[in-house]
């Protein structure tokens, strides 16, 4: 039994608060245990210079964390004058993941900006950002379809992400909080589609190694968790993506 009472294969309580911010075309507050991330999607009628005239759209992301989202205050990156390597990695990860489930030609020459702002962090902020960002993006795209800006939705599949890890005492664990992540011998972030295909795997042994059997167990655990997350996404989106039922 984990310190928070969960079973090894149990997700933290998760909720999606849609339309959390008024102004963006899509907005979601995702809460996973004590981790809370605001995910906003904004539509811009232009694309980066390298895509102009090509008829394709673009999806990109920015990620940040409030100074007191963590136990100790962290200095805002804007005050430092540069984005950290960790932030850059997470931003690119979110953008790559979302582009994997969107037909950019159907989106047309427009950009969807995803802003993920962590307001409280207790592990799994990047995976929560991806899961929430997909919902915000889907809502924004649904509005484009409903208003006739685009004819059909370019979203090709659902998308969610989760963390898994291996603890010396507890074994394989799903959806690690900060304490578990800090103590894990192995931790992984897994991104998958609704049809069960992998988008990205990030795995590291923390002063430890793991076997092929361990890897298979971690992937199976992640798949179970992601299926649950995607089912919850479907429930809250309702008729936004009817073609993906």
UniProtKB/Swiss-Prot annotation:
Its EC number is 2.7.7.56. It comes from the Bacteria. Phosphate binds at residues 86, 124-126. One of its GO terms (molecular function) is 3'-5'-RNA exonuclease activity. Keywords: Nucleotidyltransferase, RNA-binding, rRNA processing, Transferase, tRNA processing, tRNA-binding. It catalyses: tRNA(n+1) + phosphate = tRNA(n) + a ribonucleoside 5'-diphosphate. It holds the Pfam family RNase_PH_C. GO terms for biological process: rRNA catabolic process; rRNA processing; tRNA processing. InterPro entries: ExoRNase_PH_dom1, ExoRNase_PH_dom2, ExoRNase_PH_dom2_sf, PNPase/RNase_PH_dom_sf, Ribosomal_Su5_D2-typ_SF, RNase_PH, RNase_PH_bac-type, RNase_PH_CS. Belongs to the RNase PH family. Homohexameric ring arranged as a trimer of dimers. Phosphorolytic 3'-5' exoribonuclease that plays an important role in tRNA 3'-end maturation. Removes nucleotide residues following the 3'-CCA terminus of tRNAs; can also add nucleotides to the ends of RNA molecules by using nucleoside diphosphates as substrates, but this may not be physiologically important. Probably plays a role in initiation of 16S rRNA degradation (leading to ribosome degradation) during starvation. This is Ribonuclease PH. It comes from Bacillus velezensis (strain DSM 23117 / BGSC 10A6 / LMG 26770 / FZB42).
